């Protein structure tokens, strides 16, 4: 049995959660392999006949299916107070997660001091700040890389945990000065949290391989997106983990040969949050239209997202690394009101077309985007559920993307509702 994967193909916020929610109806395990509570999305589902909105940040959104088990793998970093706050919020809305949510004993822990340090680092960087969510994700991964981080299993060795915790905090004091922090109070708080956490902790490698060996269907929900990957994104304006297909293997302990269908989620235009080059960004009426009609505000931070045309130079780079088998094109309805739609197909620098995506951001900031202009459809598509019923120009836009990327689009999002998703057959 192989693992299916859903990955963000741009700079995040593509709408991965909605597809995961739909696919979760046919899966047994939904796993996360990277990131922390720095990502976020909202899913609207009917519970007992009433539509309810659930906000996910850290927990796998497949939990909306009551028959699905959620797993946070070893590649995830976990802030326990946020974990329990999110879990309590979901359960208070009627989503029972009893005996169907598990955490890897190898996962790294995020502490409040990581969040404080995250803010201090941004202040230190000043005008060069990356624009993090200040959730402590970067400092936690930094501790992991320097082998000073604490993992979930350390919580169950109280004396060892306390000694390691004091040492790590003291190291942060030496680096950033003595900021206000109750070290002993935190040790006591985590002693109590450890007991509450104990029933959720498993050896995630054994867990997922046992599930696969028994024929269970596993779906991996990627966090963030390819252009935020620590290696392949617009470094340093990236997150601190591997958000590419490679992170699926390292973040869950599964071999590449077990990775099956890989689905890329791509927004019909482009957005990003925070600083960094954005070649197709539209600082004009088009950008305002995309932002307002698309409700482009972050679930985690509430920040306005920067908006621009679809960038196929980004997508070609993304395809090379993740090897998508299919796409879910999302928020296509946001383009309904536009007379014409531009698509960036390549970059030129100093008059020469580039053959690959630049690693050097100084070069990326100077590129000229080569656009193709397509006609708009000027017709609302939110109520359409059959591909054949889409306007002709809308189908031309979809076909153009497929032809350029040589990957089929199997799902098309045409609105925020759970049912606002068109399934496209290969012969259409």
UniProtKB/Swiss-Prot annotation:
Catalyzed reaction equations: IMP + L-aspartate + GTP = N(6)-(1,2-dicarboxyethyl)-AMP + GDP + phosphate + 2 H(+)
UniProt EC number: 6.3.4.4
Pathway(s) where this gene product acts: Purine metabolism; AMP biosynthesis via de novo pathway; AMP from IMP: step 1/2
Active-site residues, as the UniProt record annotates them: 13, 41
GO biological-process terms attached to the record: 'de novo' AMP biosynthetic process; IMP metabolic process
Gene3D superfamilies linked to this entry: Adenylosuccinate Synthetase, subunit A, domain 1, Adenylosuccinate Synthetase, subunit A, domain 2, Adenylosuccinate Synthetase, subunit A, domain 3
Residues that bind GTP: 12-18, 40-42, 305, 331-333, 413-415
EC class (word): ligase
Single GO MF descriptor: magnesium ion binding
A Gene Ontology cellular-component term: cytoplasm
Subcellular location field: Cytoplasm
Record-listed IMP binding positions: 13-16, 38-41, 133, 147, 224, 239, 303
Alphabetized PROSITE patterns for the sequence: ADENYLOSUCCIN_SYN_1, ADENYLOSUCCIN_SYN_2
Family of this protein: Belongs to the adenylosuccinate synthetase family.
Name of the featured protein: Adenylosuccinate synthetase
Originating species: Coprinopsis cinerea (strain Okayama-7 / 130 / ATCC MYA-4618 / FGSC 9003) (Inky cap fungus)
């Amino acid at each position: 049995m192989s693992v299916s994967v859903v990955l963000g193909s741009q700079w995040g916020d593509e709408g991965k959660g909605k597809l995961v929610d739909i696919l979760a109806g046919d899966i047994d395990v939904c796993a996360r392999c990277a990131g922390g509570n720095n990502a976020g999305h909202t899913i609207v589902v009917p519970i007992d006949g009433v539509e309810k909105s659930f906000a996910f940040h850290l927990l796998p959104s497949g939990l909306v299916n009551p028959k699905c088990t959620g797993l946070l793998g070893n590649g995830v970093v976990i802030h326990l107070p946020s974990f329990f706050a999110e879990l309590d919020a979901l359960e208070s809305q009627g989503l029972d997660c009893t005996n169907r949510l598990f955490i890897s004993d190898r996962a790294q822990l995020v502490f409040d001091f990581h969040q404080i340090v995250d803010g201090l680092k941004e202040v230190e960087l000043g005008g060069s700040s990356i624009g993090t969510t200040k959730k402590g994700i970067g400092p936690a991964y930094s501790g992991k890389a320097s082998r000073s981080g604490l993992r979930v299993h350390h919580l169950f060795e109280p004396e060892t945990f306390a000694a390691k915790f004091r040492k790590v905090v003291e190291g942060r004091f030496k680096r950033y000065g003595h900021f206000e922090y109750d070290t002993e109070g935190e040790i006591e708080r985590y002693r109590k949290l450890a007991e509450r956490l104990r029933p959720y902790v498993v050896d995630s490698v054994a867990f997922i391989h046992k599930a696969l060996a028994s024929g269970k269907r596993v779906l991996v929900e990627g966090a963030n997106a390819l252009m935020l990957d620590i290696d392949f994104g617009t470094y340093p304006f990236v997150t601190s983990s591997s958000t590419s297909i490679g992170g699926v293997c390292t973040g869950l302990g599964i071999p590449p040969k077990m990775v099956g269908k890989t689905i890329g989620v791509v927004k019909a235009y482009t957005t990003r949050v925070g600083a960094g080059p954005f070649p197709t960004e539209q600082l004009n009426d088009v950008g305002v239209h995309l932002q307002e009609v698309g409700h482009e505000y972050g679930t985690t931070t509430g920040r306005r997202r920067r908006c621009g045309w679809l960038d196929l130079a980004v997508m070609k780079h993304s395809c090379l690394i993740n090897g998508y088998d299919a796409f879910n094109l999302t928020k296509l309805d946001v383009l309904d009101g536009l007379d014409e739609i531009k698509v960036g197909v390549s970059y030129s620098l100093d008059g020469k077309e580039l053959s690959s995506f630049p690693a050097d951001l100084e070069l990326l900031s100077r590129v000229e985007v080569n656009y193709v202009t397509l006609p708009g459809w000027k017709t609302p598509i939110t109520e359409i559920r059959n591909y054949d019923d889409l306007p002709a120009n809308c189908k031309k836009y979809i076909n153009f993307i497929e032809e350029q990327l040589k990957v089929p689009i199997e799902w098309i999002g045409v609105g925020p509702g759970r049912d606002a998703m068109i399934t496209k057959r290969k012969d259409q």
